[in-house]
Swiss-Prot record:
Gene name in the database record: atpA
A single Gene Ontology CC term: proton-transporting ATP synthase complex
CDD domains assigned to the protein according to its UniProt record, in alphabetical order: ATP-synt_F1_alpha_C, ATP-synt_F1_alpha_N, F1-ATPase_alpha_CD
Protein name, UniProt field: ATP synthase subunit alpha
InterPro entries: ATP_synth_asu-like_sf (IPR023366), ATP_synth_asu_C (IPR000793), ATP_synth_asu_C_sf (IPR038376), ATP_synth_F1_a_nt-bd_dom (IPR033732), ATP_synth_F1_asu (IPR005294), ATPase_a/bsu_AS (IPR020003), ATPase_F1/V1/A1_a/bsu_N (IPR004100), ATPase_F1/V1/A1_a/bsu_N_sf (IPR036121)
């Protein structure tokens, strides 16, 4: 078959018009050094800071250090497939993480990959892990309470929604227990929780996840894990990923609580990466911007203005001190960034006073305005009573020579210290806390043996549940002690005390 000249020309024209050159331009670089979770590459001239990069082995990397003739890349995974001469290409996007309701109840790594074996996470939204914190105009002062369920904290060091409250202390003083108790106490509230484990042992993290499952707390909790065996880049990213997940709830008019356990290990991971990419070391070999590392993270916790949905993100960072040295570099940095600290003391812990909170050194700088009125009414004298007791404690051995007023102060103090003790993972509703502290500060415990105070407290809760449910409900609703509540409260305590056998 022969084609006419004109037909052949038309076919050729249409073919040329529909011809597409499917050329995809990619900017690539070449790795010239790799080791310890860090690679250096040349050729990535237009790369952005914190841009996600991809190695030819399939591993992801993050542009961490931008220099004149090379890029320092932190490897987000195994470096085993990356060698000198490997190709690394730009993706053109900043590192982001999945966010949203789909992550509730899941355990993930800092890149958003599931670790719990419950299948893929089909998140509808993604958000950059590094974000600028809300400005002054977008914020509202902290005014709603975030109840921890721990008597000593809710009474004397109250925390509000949108606050940053540091939990600081030596190893094995109960820091994680305080944070987990706070998560457990959000069970019947509208607060979503995020627990970020940074550099923790896998067995410890597994135990915490099991506890959260057992107590029904995983229904509203997301766990982000970068364990001790994970490379430093993942430990560095973990808190930022957790914060991004919490910000999704904050920005959608909801409330979230995030626990960073702990930021000491986070600073160490950052120090390791900074030294490997040859950033100049400063005090304790930390880089000069380690303050900014934590300030930009913790400033993202905020209470937003009503026009923006009135959401909040509350942060509980944990710092581990060495031999009680609160004046070390990282502890002082984080103390100055946060809105107060809860200081846990080994001496108190070893004496059996748990939670081992040193009330003198602990403070909440903004939470007072968030405390419910009923708690303010009963706990007003509590801190003062305990301070007077601590002053006179040294004279206890001379008990027989003391005047009656001093003896009464010591006796009241001993009972209050006993009353503030609390077992782990057993948060108490705030209305019951109010009644117990009212009993302590109004002399109901003064003639009860110190050894029976805990028994008195536990039996009192049972008695109230059985006989004075209306009083608990009224306290919960009114959140204040008016004359009617006060008379019911006195009646309940008098009745219970008459039937109590120490």
């Amino acid at each position: 078959m022969t084609l006419a000249y004109d037909d052949a020309l038309e076919i050729l024209k249409s073919q040329l018009q529909s011809f597409e050159t499917d050329i995809k331009m990619e900017e690539v670089g070449v790795v010239y050094a790799v080791g310890d979770g860090v690679a250096r590459a040349y050729g990535l001239d237009n790369v952005m800071a914190n841009e996600l990069l991809e190695f030819d082995s399939g591993e992801a990397g993050l542009a961490f250090n931008l220099e004149e003739d090379n890029v320092g890349i932190i490897i987000l995974g195994s470096e085993s497939g990356i060698k000198e001469g490997s190709i690394v290409k730009r993706t053109g996007r900043i590192l982001d993480a999945p966010v949203g309701e789909e992550l509730v109840g899941r355990v993930i790594d800092p890149l958003g990959n599931p670790l719990d074996g419950k299948g893929p996470i089909n998140a509808k939204h993604r958000s950059p892990v590094e974000k600028i914190a809300p400005g002054i105009v977008k914020r509202k002062s902290v005014h709603e309470p975030l109840q921890t369920g721990i008597k000593a904290i809710d009474a004397m060091i109250p925390i509000g929604r949108g606050q940053r409250e540091l939990i600081i202390g030596d190893r094995a003083t109960g820091k994680t227990t305080v944070a987990i108790d706070t998560i457990l106490n959000q069970k019947d509230t509208d607060v979503y929780c995020i627990y970020v484990a940074i550099g923790q042992k896998k067995s410890t993290t597994a135990r915490i996840i099991e506890l959260l499952e057992r107590e029904g707390a995983m229904k509203y909790t997301t766990v982000v894990v970068a364990s001790a065996t994970d490379p430093a880049p993942l430990q560095y990213l973990a808190p930022f990923t957790g914060c991004t997940i919490g910000e999704y709830f904050r920005d959608n008019g909801k409330h979230a609580l995030i626990v960073y356990d702990d930021l000491s290990k986070h600073a160490e991971a950052y120090r390791q990466l900074s030294l490997l990419v040859r950033r100049p070391p400063g005090r304790e070999a930390y880089p000069g911007d380690v303050f900014y590392l934590h300030s930009r993270l913790l400033e993202r916790a905020a209470k937003l203005y009503d026009e923006l949905g009135a959401g909040s993100l509350t942060a509980l960072p944990i710092i581990e001190t060495k031999a009680g040295d609160v004046s070390a570099y990282i502890p002082t940095n984080v103390i100055s960034i946060t809105d107060g600290q809860i200081y846990l003391e080994p001496d108190l812990f070893n004496k059996g006073i748990r939670p081992a909170i040193n009330v003198g050194l602990s403070v909440s700088r903004v939470g007072g305005s968030a405390q419910i009125k009923a708690m303010k009414q009963v706990a007003g004298t509590l801190r003062l009573d305990l301070a007077q007791f601590r002053e006179l404690e040294a004279f206890m051995q001379f008990a027989s020579d003391l005047d009656k007023a001093t003896q009464d102060t010591i006796n009241r103090g001993l009972r209050l210290v006993e009353l503030l003790k609390q077992g782990p993972y057993s948060p108490i509703p705030v209305e019951k806390q109010v009644i117990a502290i009212y009993a302590g500060t109004n002399g109901y415990l003064d003639d009860i043996p110190v050894s029976s105070v805990r028994k008195f407290e536990m039996e009192l809760y049972g008695f109230l549940d059985a006989n004075f449910k209306d009083l608990l409900d009224e306290l919960k609703t009114k959140k204040a002690i008016d004359d009617s509540v006060k008379s019911k409260l006195k009646t309940a305590l008098d009745k219970f005390k008459a039937s109590f056998i120490p």
